[in-house]
């Protein structure tokens, strides 16, 4: 991957440094995200479904309510319920009423969901090494720090 430069995106007027940086982030996200989607496709998952499974794995046995899952998504979407429906139909998640608060329904990852993630952990680690392995540790740390700083406004 090469950095996005002004000359790659012909415009009538020059881009501001902020616009050039934003465009670079968007193009890079599209490239990396497309490659992730291609890796997940043979495993029957979309990137958002994979993200939900990772979120639920991180939640442990307690699981999470629908709105908590939605708050943690990389790309929040309006229909977390439908996402959870699909994952539950595939046997990768299960939902049950919260015994402490019967108004709440908690989603949990199933053993099949954990097994699917275990299959994918190595696959995606290898992909991320192919995507960004050409950057050294100091560059990766700097990139991570800059992206985190860009999210804080």
Task: Give residue ranges: language-model regions.
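Short, charged, intrinsically disordered terminal tails
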Residues: 65, 151-153
């Amino acid at each position: 991957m090469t950095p996005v430069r002004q000359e790659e995106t012909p415009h009538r007027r020059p881009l501001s440094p902020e616009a050039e940086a934003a465009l670079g982030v968007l193009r890079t996200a599209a490239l990396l995200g497309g490659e992730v989607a291609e890796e997940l496709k043979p495993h029957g998952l979309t990137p958002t479904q994979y993200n939900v499974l990772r979120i639920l794995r991180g939640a442990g046995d307690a699981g999470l309510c629908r709105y908590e899952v939605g708050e943690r998504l990389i790309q929040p979407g309006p229909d977390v319920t439908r996402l959870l429906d699909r994952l539950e139909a595939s046997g990768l998640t299960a939902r049950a009423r919260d015994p402490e608060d019967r108004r709440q329904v908690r989603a949990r990852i199933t053993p099949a969901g954990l097994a699917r993630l275990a299959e994918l952990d190595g696959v995606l680690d290898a992909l991320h090494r192919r995507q960004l392995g050409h950057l050294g540790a100091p560059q990766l740390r700097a990139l991570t720090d800059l992206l985190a700083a860009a999210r804080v406004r």
